[in-house]
């Protein structure tokens, strides 16, 4: 748990920064009184998952501080891409100023995101992204570097005869792909 606390705090700070940036982007005049409407669609809402609980809490705190309206729409499982896309479609129909989105797939949401952009809805990717660069802003960890650092550390603990299994969370999500890439780079010729 200790190793995750730093990551969770960092993500919460990044979420607050994202809302601050959005407040500035969406505010055409310094005297604007209209509240910014935001919808956040994380990969999952699960009170037993410290990471997503912290991300959602950080978004809520930042929205409150900057007097923005925030609605959270989340699927029941991280790998439930179909449900996440249904929620994205619902969010687009509500026409918020911005959609904050943590895609569970690198390519299955692109058409919906294009539709949102066509309707003038700003898009912020949080934690992961899609293949097409449809976002106005991305708030994420450098997952290749994080994986590389872990691979370099693991390399110190193993020898050439060691066998390593890489087990990922959700297949095809950008965070998993990048972390594995970095881990393999960090292992070097041990990979």
What name fits each language-model region?
Residues 9-24:
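Hydrophobic membrane-insertion alpha-helices, especially the h-region
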Residues 25-55, 65, 72, 136-137, ...:
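Short beta-strand segments enriched in small/hydrophobic residues
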Residues 49-60, 81, 85, 110, ...:
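Short, surface-exposed alpha-helical segments at coil->helix boundaries
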Residues 71-93:
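Structural motif
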Residues 89-92, 98-117, 183:
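Hydrophobic alpha-helical
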Residues 92-103, 122-126, 165-166:
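Periplasmic-binding protein-like
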Residues 106-145, 163:
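Flexible loop/hinge segments that line or gate small-molecule binding clefts
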Residues 150-190:
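An alpha-beta-alpha
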